From Swiss-Prot:
Key enzyme in the regulation of glycerol uptake and metabolism. Catalyzes the phosphorylation of glycerol to yield sn-glycerol 3-phosphate. This is Glycerol kinase. Belongs to the FGGY kinase family. Its EC number is 2.7.1.30. ADP binds at residues 12, 16, 265, 308, 411. The keyword Electron transport does not apply.
Length: 498
């Protein structure tokens, strides 16, 4: 049977290729980790060629596991780590430098210099982003300034810039396509999300030649055909989205007011604001959720640096648990009369505080505080931080009501206790889907719907399946008291007043 969909999920630490059949069932999976390079303090790099090899390898593993050939694959969808920056020679296809990863902080001083020139409002107005090293623009400027001869080659159109999706499409098509999608473009710091174009003024400020930029397409579009030398046949690449936006799609959050939150090492929450390009007054990011049929849907995005990483800390540094899965059962044993707060600012605090110098702290310890109370505090910190994001979103946009339902995914959502506490603190329902791999599902749907094999948005939304809905059950006075304690704890960790 033909009509299979291949979804490539190129992440920060590993690459996965997943095959779906016509009924949206997973029939094959390949996964491979790759090397993390740390050449200097705060620097993080990937070998783009190693990533490309991991994609080829995982595709072959998935095909073998499914027992099918590449000729049975109708379309390819790609989702990827956002903002990671690659520059390669347009003819040879060889990278000029290792990829600079989104986590890399080498351009912090440059960002500070731009802020001192009072340029952040201009960047935010056009891109919806803040002047931060996370985003691609200052990484690309660094490469142009530090790789000998690169600027001249860029001005002559001899090199290509792209995020990981662009790099993979270029390699998959044998160098024929230099393209990206609107969601990945929206994270570069040089793309005008209101006018859907590369912004000449921002390019000029950062010193980036337009000749090296990819063409920007809808998320479901014709991105090119794979080189038949790779898998024996040409397969159309029909869907692309950055990882967090792909999770919005995979969770079928197609209506304004719908919200998804992904809980992994950190947490990314996105709220669909429809065609409203909301300007945040709470230092949230305004971004493109997806662009389909030429229509741009926007989102407010907030990021939490430490979510599942707090559980890893309990396991690896504190030795309170042996494996992460033990934490929920331990938290359930906590003394309900103790109110312990963990502010996990191990690497600063993200949205809406954006305090890079804040550091973690624990409040409320008594002689009776033990492992169980620490476990509960770690899990509750995720709920409190999500509350901060939702409250900021509600302050920014009238469409974010108290009736918002949160759809969740990621490793932490398997814990019933954590999801119930999340619903209690948010005072909002939390929906956990049957299929938790929503990021790769979103990439698959983009390609499959474009190919006419899977249903359209309405049909896909109807087929989205909920595993469990967690309804808020905490008394309002208890909830208000708990949140007040959290706010007091956070205020003691901040290095600057809010």
């Amino acid at each position: 049977m033909s009509g299979y969909i291949l979804a490539i999920d190129q992440g920060t630490t590993s690459t996965r290729s997943m095959l779906f059949d016509r009924n949206m069932r997973v029939v094959g999976l390949g996964q491979q980790e790759f090397t993390q390079h740390f050449p200097s303090s705060g620097w993080v790099e990937h070998d783009a060629e190693e990533i490309w090899k991991s994609v080829q390898s995982t595709i072959r593993i998935a095909l073998a596991q499914a027992g099918i050939s590449a000729a049975d694959v109708a379309a390819i969808g790609i989702t990827n780590q956002r903002k990671t920056t690659v520059v390669w020679d347009r003819i040879s296809g060889k990278p000029v430098h290792r990829a600079i990863v989104w986590q890399d902080r080498r351009t912090a001083q440059f960002c500070d210099e731009l802020k001192r020139r009072n340029l952040e409002p201009l960047f935010t107005e056009k891109t919806g982003l803040l002047l931060d090293p996370y985003f691609s623009g200052t990484k690309l400027a660094w490469l142009l300034n530090h790789v000998p001869g690169l600027r001249e080659r860029a001005q002559k159109g001899q090199v290509c810039f792209g995020t990981i999706d662009s790099w993979l499409i270029y390699k998959l098509t044998g160098g024929k396509a230099h393209v990206t999608d609107a969601t990945n473009a929206s994270r570069t710091l040089i793309y005008h999300i209101g006018e859907n174009r590369w912004d000449d003024e921002l390019l000029d400020i950062l010193g980036i030649p337009a000749a090296m930029l990819p063409e920007v397409k809808d998320c479901a579009a014709d991105f090119g055909m794979t080189d038949p030398a790779l898998f024996g046949v040409s397969i159309p690449i029909l869907g692309v989205a950055g990882d967090q936006q792909a999770a919005v799609i995979g969770n079928a959050c197609f209506e304004p007011g719908m919200m998804k939150s992904t809980y992994g090492t950190g947490c990314f929450a996105l709220l669909n604001t429809g065609t409203d390009r909301v300007t945040s007054s709470n230092r949230l990011l305004t971004t493109i959720a997806y662009r389909l049929d030429g229509v741009t849907t926007y989102a407010l995005e907030g990021s939490i640096f430490i979510a599942g990483a707090a559980v890893q800390w309990l396991r690896d540094e504190m030795g309170f648990i042996s494996v992460a899965s033990e934490v929920s059962a331990l938290a359930e044993k906590a003394d309900p009369n103790q109110r312990i707060y963990l502010v996990p600012a191990f690497t600063g605090l993200g949205a809406p505080y954006w305090d890079a110098e804040a550091r973690g702290a624990i409040f409320g310890l008594t002689r009776g505080t033990g492992r169980a109370e620490f476990a509960r505090a770690a899990l509750e910190s995720v709920a409190y931080q999500t509350f901060d994001l939702l409250e900021a979103m509600q302050g920014d946009w009238k469409g974010a009501t108290n009736h918002t339902v949160l759809r969740v995914d990621g490793g932490m959502v398997a814990s019933d206790w954590t999801m119930q506490r999340l619903a209690d603190i948010l005072n909002a329902p939390v929906d956990r889907p049957v299929f938790l791999e929503t990021t790769v599902l979103g990439a698959a749907w983009l390609a499959a719907s474009r190919a006419g094999i899977w249903p359209d948005r309405k049909g896909f939304s109807e087929r989205w399946q909920r595993d469990c809905r967690f309804e808020p059950a905490m008394p309002e006075k208890e909830r208000e008291s708990a949140i007040a304690g959290w706010r007091d704890s956070v205020s003691r960790c901040l290095t600057r007043p809010q």
